[in-house]
Each structure stands twice: as structure tokens, then as C-alpha cells.
Amino acid sequence: VLYAAGRTFIAGADIKEFGKPQGDPQLRDVIAAIENSPKPVVAALHGTPLGGGLEVALGCHYRVALPGTRAGTPEVKLGLIPGAGGTQRLPRAIGVEAALDMVTSGRFVPAEEALELGLLDAIATESDPLAAGVTFAKEILDAKLPPRPLSGWNDRLACDPGIFDETREKLRRKTRGQLSPLAGVDAVEAATKLDFAEGMKREREIFRDCMESPQRAALIHAFFGERAVAKVPGLSEETAPREVNSVAVIGAGTMGGGIALALAAAGLHVDLIEKSQDALDAGLSRIRKTLDSSVSRGSLTAAQAEERLGRTGPARGSDHLGGAAAGRAGNRREKSSTSS
């Protein structure tokens, strides 16, 4: 039984290591050793088995998961494809169409869907991954089931050859120049045209091309950048969040009105600031039309719309902004400001 302690099964590689020389043993070789075991190997999954973690699970002969488990191949979001056999084993497990979806979207698949697709053999009733794995392993032994390497499964590779070009066309329209989704299609297509060993070689070639791409470097830079902006230098983890009750939004145009609506929906009072009364009136009119449209669609009740409109107050000039700034300086719990 292969399982992980803590909050999750293997959740993928350390992104900080991407692009650096890899040491031995290579992950694909470790997975091959697991798959070639003469004894059945059960992967007991929980949390979020992602990327290389899911590839390890695919190298096992059977897979059982705790309720709430979500699995995926998010490499595409970082400009990559699964590089340790994921594009070759996944279509053998769940079929070509489902594999294309997972590899090119990077979405997380919940346990119930994974079971339906064939990615899982069972969803456990236990709350502990080791106990779940042992229970399932005993069932395998009682049934005298043999090892079941996915590398030898070819039945689910049958598909309409046109699916690959259709998927590429959809992705070109949707992803607008992103390379890794198309690379994922190429790798999954290789699984249907080459034997497993040759498919693995092709996957590796495609993975290396992605790894050397400036797009991959840019996407990983953006990944870390998005997380860095959430950290305030010099602010300790013990610092309590500041309570914000009122916000000033400068500009009542389309974007400013949208920001004001979002803040009002969050329960905040909004001072909407413009230079002229005409601009203020136009901005408030747009906000009311947006709320009326939400009521017409049924996404808001009339009472909710009026409540949000009531939290949005008009103001001319920068006096209110000055008040907001003074409020921050004098009472950090009362007022903030933003500009659109």
C-alpha cells in the first residue's frame, strides 16, 4: 500500500526546482519500478494528488481514495505537460476524451467523477488513508487479483482520430497562443499511435520542449508573483486583519461602478467619488441598471438590490477621499480607499 501521511497524498513536484538539473532516480523510473512490482500495489489517496503525485498513483495497480479527494494534472497552467508517464497512462485508464480534458485544462477532478471515469477503483469509507489502503488490499488478496499495470492497457485508447484536431482548434480559440495545452494534445495523441515505450519517449521530448520554452518561465514567474503580492513585507503572521467598513472609490465609470457593486455586495458602504454631478449621476444610473438586470435574471431579489444600492453613496470632489485618508490615519478600523 502506497500512502502519504499529513494533509494530502503527493501533491506534485516543487515548482522552485523546475528548470534545474534533475538527480537520480528520475520520477519516471521510480514509477516504472512500482508498476513492475510482482505484487499488487494499491495507492491510497487523500487530499489533492496532483501532477507527479497523480502519475505515481497511475503507476500503482489499483487506486482507492478517501471522500473529498481531488486529483488533477495542473502542469498545463505552468506551461508544461505531465512528464513522468501521465499522458500515456491516463488515457489508458480513463479514455482519450477524458484524458484530453484533464491534461489540457488542469482542472481538479473530484473523487466521485474519478471513480466514474475509471481513475479510481473505489472510494473508501474509512477516514484514514492507510486503513483504506489496507482494507482494499485485503479485498484484492481475497479475490486473488493480479498486478494490473496500466502500461499494458490499450482497450480504452480507441477513439475517433478527429478528436485531436477538434481539440486543438477549440484550444487555439480558448487559450490564444498558450503552447502547453496543444503540447498536451500531442502527447495524448502519441499514446494512441505508438506503443507504450515509444509513447514515453515522445512525452519526454514534448516535456523538454515545454520546459525550455520562455512561456513556461513566464507562467511560473507569474505563479510566484501572484502569491508574493499577498504578502506584506514586515507584517507578521500574528497581525490581526484590519476591519474595513467603508471604502471610497474614485471614478464612477464602468470599472469603478463594478468595483463599487462588488464592495457593496460584500457588505461595505461605498463613497463613489467623481469630479462632476453629471458623471456621478451617470455612474449611479449604470449601477442601478446592473442591479435591475440581476433582479430580472433572478440572481438577486429586489430587496437585495435596494440594499446594495443603499450602501453606495454619491460624493463630488476629493473631500471624501481626504476623509477616507484621515480615517485611515486616525482610525484604522473604519475607512479605506481605492481608485479605479
Spans of model-derived segments:
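Amphipathic alpha-helical segments at domain termini/boundaries
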Residues: 7, 11, 55-59, 102-206, ...
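Gly/Pro- and small hydrophobic-enriched strand-loop and loop-to-helix capping segments
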Residues: 61-83, 118-132, 273, 277
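Hydrophobic, secondary-structure "cap" segments at the distal end of domains
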Residues: 87-97
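NAD(P)+-binding Rossmann beta1-loop-alpha1 motif at the extreme N-terminus of oxidoreductases
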Residues: 231-290, 313
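Glycine-rich beta-to-alpha active-site loop
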Residues: 34-78, 82, 251-254, 259-260
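Short, well-ordered beta-strand core segments
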Residues: 41, 63-64, 123, 247, ...
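Rossmann-like NAD(P)-binding element
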Residues: 278-279, 293-340
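Glycine- (often His-adjacent) and acidic-residue-rich active-site loop
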Residues: 3-33, 49, 77-80
